[in-house]
Each structure stands twice: as structure tokens, then as C-alpha cells.
């Protein structure tokens, strides 16, 4: 924890400096590699961790070494992870997917924005200083067309996005030759299909079946294709966003870049403060990962925070505004029905979802059914025209252990299953949001209920938190639940930071939340038996046993912290080659003792083998050469 708290002015200046000096950079001893596909422009980035050789013998003067293979890993940092790419936040990222979108010939550029709010913002000269300079000309589907990845998948079309994803999900493991590294324990997948090699056809089939989604708005061509589904790697989402009392555009862009560096597969912009529209434009134009939003937040700001004043017209305009900016998925709380609200009355913590409480208040104020539910087909029509995926929000999720798995929670879940089928009629991609606060013994039911009632659409959960007693450490309490539900089949985990329940996260909180959730997601991949998931673990264990300290740091999810902790007690360069660490010291290191035991056993085997050969030689008469029939 920082000793001195920065002022708001200092925080903003720090963020501005970060943006002004931003360069592509790799993690220590890593390099960016690209694997090309068959579609034009399919060039999939990965991070390759370079390892030092293993000492296998020889003398002090002439040591003998054995090379260790470089380890390729999934990389979400986009151009920010490539030192060869010049970064200019003012111009935004290269439009990777634009040629693929244009080649399909089913979109058209809009000469006039569809959103009245967008038109008003663009006409306001007072916003020129805040505005992203290179505003994208938005596209939408041509009349009579749908432009979603689900639509293409159902038609049997393998898009460049699907091939990109197949290469990415395989994580370059075909490059690994060592049997030691390729060894993997059998997993327990709870019904997930995990092929040894992920092909573009497998990706297409999973998307067509609704078991996976590719969030990829046609107006966010800067994003690198990724997939969310239980038959793929478990993904992690990071939340950023300003509020009425804190943060600026500069700080949110900084948090975006920071999030992708530390492994965020998607980012949700949950801004509720000033300049929401302008902040989102900066984020989208500089994001290599899909961006999600909760449109009801901005709609509420447009009616001055008064839930009762919300209307379908305001909400629809907000959907069009965000879809034409390039938002990849919307969280829509369409399952909070009027008849479900009384079910929450006996809860300890009531309705804790911000979106859920907004819609519950609207329903009660008007004594009408949720307009998001009533107008759901119109929402789907908008999404189909831009390929905005739907994340059906769990507005009635439990906010405490006591309220877990109650009547209101599962009633809403069943409604989300009904809405999923409606969205699929429009070829709109869907995932389902889940809890929340759930004790460990009750977590698996959430997954089985979702699979059954939501037709195997991908599940996306906030944690769940497994206990309520640890404010300040809820990244731990939720990381436990996240690892479990990821193992059971959850496709994406929404991170929780140490500030959960306490305040808006800063940069360091974002990192802590992401590292915790990358651990949870990876642990789930190991438990499921995802092919290749154990390679990095095996490489780390081998480096640890061989006292290759630099390799241990570099293979870590957070190399900087690993190195810092080691150097607190052994800061000298000699500590980086020592065959012990500060925990046990040189005489009591279990790994060193194990090596000595192994060397002794090997020597004994040789000695016994030589004795056996000597006895055999004497038994044969001591002749150097034997006749062929005697040999």
C-alpha cells in the first residue's frame, strides 16, 4: 500500500504522463511472436518466454548445458506487448479486422448517426478538447442482412476471426517437443468437450451451437478476436470506469492498457460520471480486447439519475449510440420481472445489482413489466445489425452468503434462458451472468442450473465470493469461488479487486484483481484438463528444481513481484545462481537435497551396473572376444 496518497491533480498528471510516454514493451526475457493463418491478415500474437539452458555436467572450466525450449503463452496485450510497434493513443490502434469486415460486403457506412445523443455531443464545440480526434465512421448491416459471428457460423462460414481464435486457443503448444513439458494429468471436465487440437471448424461449430461467443462489434475493428465458452480457455474480465466523484479520461485509458498488460481478456467500461461518451470513444479506439458496457447506467445519467424517468426511447438511443461507437457486448437486465421483485423482500441484503435495482425501482414505480423484457426483440434487432453480443444480467444475484441460491435468483435465471432462445432467433450471441456471493458447497448447482435452463450458453460470473468476512481481501474470497466455478464449466470470470465493497479500484488494485483471477482461471483450466494448460507449470517446476532463478521469475504471472520478493533477502547477483533460497538456506534446501539424492542414486546404479558386468565377464571365462553363438 502506498505511503503517500496522490491528489486528484497528481493522479491525472501521472496518467497523462503514462499515456504520453507509452511504448510497446514485453515482459522480462520475453519476445512477441506471431503465428500466421490461411486467411489474409490472420497473424496471431503470442508472448514467448525465453529460458536459460540447464547445466547437465562437464567441468567448471568446460560445463555442459542442455537447451530449454521457449514457452509460448496467450497474450492479451495487443500492440502494447510488441516493442516493435509505435504507440500513439491520440491516433488509436490499427484496425486489424477492417479488411475482413469490408470483404464480407454486408455492411454500409452511416452518413448520419442513429443516436440523437451522439449527434448532440458531436455538435457541441465545447467538447472538442476532450474528444478523440480520429472519430470512426460507423457501419451497420445492410438492409436484410445480419452481421453476427453466430449468423456466419450457422451458415457454415469459417470467418478469419474463427481461424484467429483457433490458433490463439492452441497457445502455440505444437511448438513444444519436450515430453517433460507436455506431460499433463487427466482432468475432470464435467461434460466439457476439450479436443486435443482446436480447429477453426471446432470454433465455428461451438459458436453455431450457442455454446460460445465471439464478441466482435463491426465498429470495433481494433480488437483481436477472442472466444468465450466452456470448451475453451477460461477467460477473465476487468472492470474500469469513472464515477461522479473520481477518475478522468486519461486515468481510464491508463487502466485499460494496464488491464490488457496483466491479462484481461475483456474489459467492461462501467463509467457513471461525466463525459461517458467521450471516455468510451477513447477506450474503444485504443482497446485490443472486447469492450462491454451496462447501457442502463448511461441511460440513467441522461435522466439525471431518476430511475422512474427512464423510458424505452432513452434506452434505445443509448443502445444505438454505444453500438455505433463499437461496444462489443451489452449487459441487459431483462430478467428482472415485476413478479420477482417481492421474492427479494425476505433477503438479508435485498437487490445488490445496480442495474437490477434500477429496473426493480422502475417496475414498482410504474407498476409495469420491465421494459427491457417487453422490448427484448427490438434490442435483439439492434444487436444483430452491429454484432453486439448480449450478456444477460443477473439483476437478482445474491449479495450475501445468506441469500445464495434463493427463489429470486433462480427465477431470473430461468427467464434468462427464455430470452436466450429469443436472441438466437435473431442470430445474436448470448452469454449469461451469474453470482455473486455463494458458499463453496452451493457453487456447483449454479453451473448445472445454468447449463440446463440456459441451453449451454456461456456462463459469466462475478466470483462468486465464498465468504463475507474479508473486506479488503475479497479478491481472495472470490478467487476461490472463481476457480471452482471455472472448473465446473464457467466460461468467463469477472474479476474482483481488493477494493470490492470499499471503493473504486486504482491501477494497483486492477493488477491485484487480475493476477488473482488469472490464477483462478488457470487453475480451472488445469482441473478441466485443457490441452497444454500444464506446460507452463511443468516449465516452472523444472526451473525451480534446477535453481534457474531468472527463469522462475520470468515464467511467473507477475515476474516483477516474484523477483522483488526474492531480492528482499538475496539481493546480490550471486543469489540469482545460488542453489538455495532464503527460506531454508544452503544446508536445508529440499530441492538441493533431492538433487544430491538423485545424483547419488544415479552413481550407485552405475556402480552396481559395473559390478554386474564384471561378474558376468568373469563367468564367461574372462575372454575379451566370444564366438557368435556364445555372445
Swiss-Prot record:
- Binding, substrate: 239, 268, 297, 333, 353-355, 394-397, 433, 460
User: According to the UniProt record, what class of enzyme is this?
Assistant: lyase
UniProt: Zn(2+) binding residues:
437, 501
Catalytic activity, EC: 4.1.99.17
One Pfam family per UniProt:
ThiC-associated
Alphabetically ordered keywords of this record:
4Fe-4S, Iron, Iron-sulfur, Lyase, Metal-binding, S-adenosyl-L-methionine, Thiamine biosynthesis, Zinc
- Output the Gene Ontology cellular-component terms: cytosol
Using the record, list the residue span of the signal peptide; answer none if the entry has no such feature: none
Q: Where does [4Fe-4S] cluster bind?
A: 581, 584, 589
Give the pathway listed in the UniProt entry for this protein: Cofactor biosynthesis; thiamine diphosphate biosynthesis
GO BP terms = thiamine biosynthetic process; thiamine diphosphate biosynthetic process
What's the catalysed reaction? Answer: 5-amino-1-(5-phospho-beta-D-ribosyl)imidazole + S-adenosyl-L-methionine = 4-amino-2-methyl-5-(phosphooxymethyl)pyrimidine + CO + 5'-deoxyadenosine + formate + L-methionine + 3 H(+)
Superkingdom classification of source: Bacteria
Name the cofactor(s): [4Fe-4S] cluster
Molecular function GO labels? 4 iron, 4 sulfur cluster binding; carbon-carbon lyase activity; zinc ion binding
Q: How is the cofactor bound?
A: Binds 1 [4Fe-4S] cluster per subunit. The cluster is coordinated with 3 cysteines and an exchangeable S-adenosyl-L-methionine.
The entry assigns this protein to a family as follows: Belongs to the ThiC family.
Role this protein plays: Catalyzes the synthesis of the hydroxymethylpyrimidine phosphate (HMP-P) moiety of thiamine from aminoimidazole ribotide (AIR) in a radical S-adenosyl-L-methionine (SAM)-dependent reaction.
Q: How does it assemble?
A: Homodimer.
Q: What is this protein called?
A: Phosphomethylpyrimidine synthase
Q: In which organism is this protein found?
A: Escherichia coli O1:K1 / APEC
At the highest ranks, the source species' classification is: Bacteria, Pseudomonadati, Pseudomonadota, Gammaproteobacteria, Enterobacterales
Amino acid at each position: 500500500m502506498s505511503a503517500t496518497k496522490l491528489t486528484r491533480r497528481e493522479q491525472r498528471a501521472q496518467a497523462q504522463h503514462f499515456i504520453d510516454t507509452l511504448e510497446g514493451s514485453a515482459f522480462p526475457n520475453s519476445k512477441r511472436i506471431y503465428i500466421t493463418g490461411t486467411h489474409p491478415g490472420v497473424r496471431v500474437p503470442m508472448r514467448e518466454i525465453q529460458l536459460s539452458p540447464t547445466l547437465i555436467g562437464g567441468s567448471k572450466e568446460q560445463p555442459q548445458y542442455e537447451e530449454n525450449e521457449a514457452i509460448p503463452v496467450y497474450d492479451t496485450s495487443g500492440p502494447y506487448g510488441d516493442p516493435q510497434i509505435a504507440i500513439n493513443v491520440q491516433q488509436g490502434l490499427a484496425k486489424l479486422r477492417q479488411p475482413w469486415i469490408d470483404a464480407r460486403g454486408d455492411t454500409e457506412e452511416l452518413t448520419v448517426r442513429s443516436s440523437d445523443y451522439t449527434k448532440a455531443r458531436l455538435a457541441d464545440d465545447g467538447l472538442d478538447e476532450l474528444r478523440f480526434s480520429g472519430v470512426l465512421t460507423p457501419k451497420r448491416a445492410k438492409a436484410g442482412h445480419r452481421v453476427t459471428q453466430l449468423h456466419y457460423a450457422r451458415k457454415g462460414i469459417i470467418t478469419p476471426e474463427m481461424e484467429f481464435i483457433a490458433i490463439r486457443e492452441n497457445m502455440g503448444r505444437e511448438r513444444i517437443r519436450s515430453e517433460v513439458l507436455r506431460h499433463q494429468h487427466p482432468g475432470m471436465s464435467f461434460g466439457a468437450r476439450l479436443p486435443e487440437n482446436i480447429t477453426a471448424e471446432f470454433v465455428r461449430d461451438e459458436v453455431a451451437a450457442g455454446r460460445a461467443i465471439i464478441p466482435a462489434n463491426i465498429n470495433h475493428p481494433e480488437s483481436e478476436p477472442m472466444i468465450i465458452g466452456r470448451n475453451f480457455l477460461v477467460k477473465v474480465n476487468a472492470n474500469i470506469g469513472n464515477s461522479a466523484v473520481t477518475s478522468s479520461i486519461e486515468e481510464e485509458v491508463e487502466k485499460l492498457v494496464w488491464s490488457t498488460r496483466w491479462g484481461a481478456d475483456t474489459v467492461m467500461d462501467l463509467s457513471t460520471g461525466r463525459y461517458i461518451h467521450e471516455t468510451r470513444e477513447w477506450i474503444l479506439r485504443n482497446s485490443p480486447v472486447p469492450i462491454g458496457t451496462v447501457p442502463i447506467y448511461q441511460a440513467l445519467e441522461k435522466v439525471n439519475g431518476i430511475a422512474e424517468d427512464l423510458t424505452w426511447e432513452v434506452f434505445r438511443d443509448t443502445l444505438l449510440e454505444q453500438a455505433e461507437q463499437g461496444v462489443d457486448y451489452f449487459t441487459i437486465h431483462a430478467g428482472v420481472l415485476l413478479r420477482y421483485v417481492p421474492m427479494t423482500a425476505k433477503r438479508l441484503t435485498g437487490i445488490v445489482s445496480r442495474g437490477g435495482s434500477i429496473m426493480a425501482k422502475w417496475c414498482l414505480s410504474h407498476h409495469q413489466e420491465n421494459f427491457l423484457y417487453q422490448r427484448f426483440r427490438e434490442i435483439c434487432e439492434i444487436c444483430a445489425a452491429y454484432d453486439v453480443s448480449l450478456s444477460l444480467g443477473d439483476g437478482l444475484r445474491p449479495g450475501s452468503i445468506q441469500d445464495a441460491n434463493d427463489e429470486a435468483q433462480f427465477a431470473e435465471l430461468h427467464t434468462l434462458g427464455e430470452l436466450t432462445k429469443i436472441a438466437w432467433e435473431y442470430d445474436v450471441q448470448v452469454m449469461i451472468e451469474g453470482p455473486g456471493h455463494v458458499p463453496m458447497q452451493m457453487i456447483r448447482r449454479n453451473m448445472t442450473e445454468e447449463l440446463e435452463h440456459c441451453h449451454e450458453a456461456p456462463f459469466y460470473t462475478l466470483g462468486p465470493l465464498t465468504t463475507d468476512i474479508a473486506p479488503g481481501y475479497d479478491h481472495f474470497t472470490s478467487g476461490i469461488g472463481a476457480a471452482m466455478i471455472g472448473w465446473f464449466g464457467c466460461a468467463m470470470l469477472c474479476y474482483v479487486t481488493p477494493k470490492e465493497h470499499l471503493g473504486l479500484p486504482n491501477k494497483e488494485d486492477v493488477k491485484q484483481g487480475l493476477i488473482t483471477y488469472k490464477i483462478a482461471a488457470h487453475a480451472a483450466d488445469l482441473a478441466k484438463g485443457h490441452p497444454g494448460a500444464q506446460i507452463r507449470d511443468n516449465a516452472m517446476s523444472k526451473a525451480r528444481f534446477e535453481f534457474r532463478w531468472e527463469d522462475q521469475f520470468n515464467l511467473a504471472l507477475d515476474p516483477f513481484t516474484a523477483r522483488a520478493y526474492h531480492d528482499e533477502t538475496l539481493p546480490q547477483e550471486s543469489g540469482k545462481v545460488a542453489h538455495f533460497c532464503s527460506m531454508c538456506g544452503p544446508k536445508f534446501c529440499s530441492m538441493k537435497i533431492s538433487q544430491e539424492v538423485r545424483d547419488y542414486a544415479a552413481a550407485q546404479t552405475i556402480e552396481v551396473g559395473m559390478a554386474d558386468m564384471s561378474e558376468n565377464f568373469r563367468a564367461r571365462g574372462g575372454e575379451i572376444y566370444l564366438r557368435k553363438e556364445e555372445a
